[in-house]
Amino acid sequence: MPVLEPRAVIDTNEARCRDCYRCVRVCPVKAIRVVHGQASVDARRCLGCGTCVRECPQGAKRYRRDLPKAEALLKTRKFVAASLAPAFAGAFEPWALLRLPAALRRLGFHYVAETAVGAAWVAQASAGLARERKAPLICTACPAAVGYVEKYRPELVPRLLPLVSPMMAHARHVKARFGAEAGFVFIGSCVAKKAEAERPELAGLVDCVLTFEELADWLRDQGIDLGHCEESAFDEVPSGSARLFPVEGGSLATAGLASGPQDLGAAALSGFEALRDGLGMGQEGGVQLIEPLMCSHGCINGPGIRSEENIFDRRLRVLRFSQAPKSGPEAAATRADLSARYQACPPSPAMAFSEEQIRQVLEQTGKGRPENQLNCGACGYASCRDQVLAVLSGMAEREMCIPYMRRMAEQRSSLIMETSPNGIVILDRDLSILNANTAFEKLVHASSLSGQPISQYVDPDPFEQVASGQVALYDAPCRDEARGLSARLIAYPLPNEDRLAGIFVALPEPGEDARQLRRLKDETVLQARELQEQQVEMARQFANYLGQHTARGEQLVKKLIKAVESEAGPAEGSLGRP
């Protein structure tokens, strides 16, 4: 039976989520839902592969930690077994491998064995079934790959081997041998195993799943140093080549169906792209068995490994350990039931959207014309159309589109400039006019100013002082009787844009009501704040994508606000902040 309300194995630290959409981009099945800029994992869609955990640059994605559950088992059960996944040979230093059994016994485990003993039994059963069936069968050792087939490739469910994973095979063996009340803790590199242990039809077999990372933390917290542990034998070790299971092609080699890359009887697939493209292969090529591993290069690259070694060194460690003499009694054939049932369980009913609905969203984001659909991927989706479908499905937001948000920000900036009663001019570093609003054109009695040097209209000296860095903020009266100019000039550099901004506040004639001056200055403060907030908002949207910062701009504009307010004093409807 499918899991109707899956318990999430991956969640989000909202305080660390920075709107970078990296998790959306790397999730193989787009199981990330973005609401109000916060990215969260949809447990129904999630495969538990842990790609988002590994890829999140802010550490905002994290898998569920089950260490308290393991500690509780050791306190409440009379007998608890530890099953160590074969990837441990790549996760720990070679000198530490035979010290792990002693360390686990110090934690309180009564039985310590390699999960590879279950892998050997599953491989033997897989080989027998593969020889009986004509269509290529799909191995079921990887829970993320099984979840992908059940949720997103239901037509391939009949091809799944009707066998449990090595973890479940080992758990059934332990329960059959030591009693149903025996506790069973699996330790490996896989986050998806946490979800597999909670499948309703397998409930009660695996009591707790830990990662190698959690085990390392546990040993550290208990003050257990592997360097001070003696070498010790496992209670059971696998037969044959089962220690190869965590590397690409390992299960096929264990089953005796692949002697090398030239063998046409089996296909080893690792990484999502390989799974997506290769799972549906037909029997024309003579393939009997397909081994899918969601993590590229296999379980030695799982998200639960904390290792500074590169993937190839980890693989070499596993290969060497598989050839080393075995320490401990070899497990005999098991009488445990290895059968399993799998069935299609799409995460949600298929949602169909009309072309008109899609067109409307494209129009709303300024991408109605094909040439405006950049397909840049900044939002995390491969194409603009994919992003629109996600928006309609409630998985994404229009605001995730960077070009759309930039256009909106630019339009808002233009609106602020055009509605301001003050003259606003934007200059490049050569002090040529890039943009000027209508109020500035009226102030200098000219139009079509773009490209013209500012010196043709006002004294350039204040802008030269700002451009040279002589002053960070210029704020002083600017009078030119010959040109009929009487204003207060506030000039400052725009952050990260290599541009200067100038705001000209018209000064009243002598004798004019002082309240008008105060009102104008208040309006200037408001406009400056709006410009600041606009810059901050634009930077927030683009910072992770463009790598820019706005701290200096905020500081300068705040100085501007403080300078104007300190001279004007508190006004009616004061704009001051606590």
Label each region the model flagged.
Residues 440-450:
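PAS/PAS-like sensory domain cap-loop motif
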Residues 398, 402-419, 513-516, 520, ...:
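Short, charged amphipathic alpha-helical "coupling" segments at sensory-output junctions
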Residues 408-441:
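Sensory modules in modular signal-transduction proteins
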Residues 2-4, 9-12, 18-42, 47, ...:
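Iron-sulfur cluster-binding cysteine motifs and their immediate structural context
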Residues 461-509:
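PAS-family sensory/regulatory modules and their coupling/dimerization elements
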Residues 520-578:
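Signal-transducing coiled-coil/dimerization helices and immediately adjacent hinge/linker segments
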Residues 493-538:
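Sensory coupling linkers of modular signal transduction proteins
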Residues 64-363, 382-390:
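Iron-sulfur-associated redox domains of electron-transfer enzymes in respiratory
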